[in-house]
C-alpha cells in the first residue's frame, strides 16, 4: 500500500520555490514537487475468510492470513489486525486483534477470529487469536502498525493514515484499496497469488478461492481432508 510521509501529505499539488544563481535568472523558479512514498514493510494481508462456521463451511473459524515478501523476518510486536463492517455508519468502530511474534521471511502468519456454529475442521494452530466475527461477504480488514483502533471510515481517510500498512476491502466494502475484492462467501476466501502481488487495487490483487490458511510453521491446507469412504466388506462366497 503506497503511503505519503506525514510531513509531506497535502503538498503533492503544490510546488517548491528554488532560488537559482543570479547569473542564470536572478529570480525564483517554481519546480514541480514529487512526494516520496513511504518504504513498504513488505507485509500484506494475503487472505481473508469470514465464512468460518457458516452454512456449508468446512472451517469452524474466520481467519486472516498475513504474508511477508521480504528476505528478513518482520517483528509484529505492537501491530494489529483490524476489522470494519462493509458499510460503516458514523458510529461504526474498528475491532482490534493485537499481534505478537514475527512473520518469517517469505512466510505466512495466521490470525484466528470468531468461531461459528458449523464447520468440522479446525484451523491450523494460529499465531494470534481474536474474537472478531467477520462477514462472509463484505467487510474491510487492515494491517496496522499500532494496536489503537483506527478512526477512519472512508477509503481516503484510511489511505492518509500512516499506521495502515495494508488494507483489504471485499464484497461491497466502502473502505478499500481501488475497488473491492470479489468472490468471498461461506465456502470461499479472497486471497493473493503466491507472489503476494500488491498493486493497491483489491479487485485485481485478490480473488475468490478455496480457503487456504497457513501459520508461521507453514502448517495448513487449502482443502480440508474429506472423510474417507469406507472400503466395502466383501460378500463371502458360498462354499461349493
Explain the meaning of each model-derived region.
Residues 203-207, 211:
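Extended alpha-helical scaffold regions
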Residues 214-240:
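Ser/Thr/Gly/Pro-rich low-complexity, disordered linker/stalk segments of secreted
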Residues 2-17, 26-186, 193-194, 200-202, ...:
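Activation on beta-sandwich/Ig-like modules and their edge loops
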